[in-house]
A protein has these predicted regions:
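Short, contiguous acidic/charged loop-to-helix segments that flank catalytic cores in large enzymes
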Residues: 128-132, 169-179, 211-220, 238-242
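Short, charged phosphate-coordinating catalytic segments
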Residues: 86-94, 144-165
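N-terminal helical hairpins
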Residues: 1-6, 17-21
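Basic, Lys/Arg- and aromatic-enriched nucleic-acid-binding interface segment
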Residues: 98-152
Length: 257
């Protein structure tokens, strides 16, 4: 087999170590997650960068889709693999064969209505420290925003075990699609703000596992939607924010931050 420092697996392992050394722990975890996925696809067989061509990369994408990953999730792994490939090209390990030409590396805009980033900033900047229920509603809105517009029902049913290796992986209740999202500091800050609940759920939306989980989710949703209207008023926004827990803000706007 191939066992050189220039092999794809070893090169990415080197990048993981480098990211840890410079303090980019989350980034190193997402690289690790992609490497695990790619190694699994390759059945553990390493390769050199000049063996990577369009056919191989397309097969990897097709394999991920077959495993149930949605387009935004396959694209998330593809972007990491492409970054490593470009770095290998820069280091002279392979000529650029443009193997990513025919695979999807973008972010789908999963939106009907979206909020400009400047307005999200206004919501995030409100001082709600003396209004815990408004603060909580705003945090849930921001969590949805950070996760590219995750719906409230998917947020409510997220499990602690869905968070692994710097990635959040969950199934959409509505479509059954498997989603993978990079876990960020802002998401972690929201979780850290609330004391750990004794349930298997990640967010404190459902707080008791007593058979009434659905009712708890529905009550919380009604309450949060009501409060989001007040938050929109306070931020001087013309539209209700409650619709935005069902539709996602624009990732294109987000990248301007």
């Amino acid at each position: 087999g191939i066992d050189t420092t220039d092999s794809v697996f070893n090169f990415i392992r080197g990048q993981i170590s480098h990211k840890k050394q410079i303090g980019k722990v989350r980034s190193s975890e997402t690289y690790r997650s992609m490497l695990n996925s790619f190694t699994y696809f390759r059945k553990g067989v390493d390769l050199t960068f000049d063996m990577m061509d369009g056919v191989l990369v397309e097969l990897y994408e097709a394999w991920m889709r077959k495993c149930g990953l949605a387009r935004n999730s396959t694209s998330f792994y593809m972007r990491i693999l492409r970054t490593n490939y470009k770095l290998a090209v820069e280091k002279g390990l392979t000529p650029d064969r443009h193997p990513f030409r025919n695979v999807y590396c973008g972010i789908d805009k999963t939106v009907k209505r979206s909020l400009p980033f400047s307005e999200v900033k206004r919501i995030n900047g409100l001082d709600l420290s003396r209004k815990p229920s408004m603060d909580f509603a705003r945090d849930m809105f921001m969590f949805s925003f950070c996760t590219r517009g995750m719906s409230f029902i998917d947020m409510a049913y997220l499990k602690k075990t869905d968070l692994n290796n710097g990635c959040l992986t969950y199934r959409r209740k509505k479509t059954g699609q498997l989603m993978t999202i990079e876990w960020t500091k802002q998401m972690q800050d929201i979780i850290d703000k609330y004391k750990p609940n004794g349930t298997s759920f990640l967010l404190p939306i459902i707080t008791r596992e007593d058979g009434n989980e659905r009712r708890q989710y529905q009550n919380q949703m009604r309450k949060i939607n009501r409060i989001l209207k007040d938050i929109a008023n306070q931020a001087g926004l013309p539209l209700s924010l409650s619709c935005l827990l069902y539709t996602s803000p624009s990732p294109r706007d987000r990248t301007r931050s």
